[in-house]
Amino acid sequence: AGSKSRSRSRSRSRSKSPAKSASPKSAASPRASR
């Protein structure tokens, strides 16, 4: 569970960045995109 919690925290921080769209991880994660 700790690993998932960190992943969400990173996703949020990247979501604010405009590079999130260029990130392949964001596209693979539909939850982070939303």
Curated annotation (Swiss-Prot):
Stretch list, region Disordered: 1-34
Free-text tissue specificity from the UniProt record: Sperm.
Keyword Amino-acid biosynthesis assigned: no
Placement of Sequence repeats on the sequence: 3-4, 5-6, 7-8, 9-10, 11-12, 13-14, 15-16
Basic residues biased stretches: 1-17
Region described as 7 X 2 AA tandem repeats of S-[KR]: 3-16
Biased composition (Low complexity): 18-34
GO cellular component: nucleus
Subcellular location: Nucleus
Keywords on record: DNA-binding, Nucleus, Repeat
MF terms in GO: DNA binding
Protein name: Sperm protein EM1
Native source organism of the sequence: Ensis minor
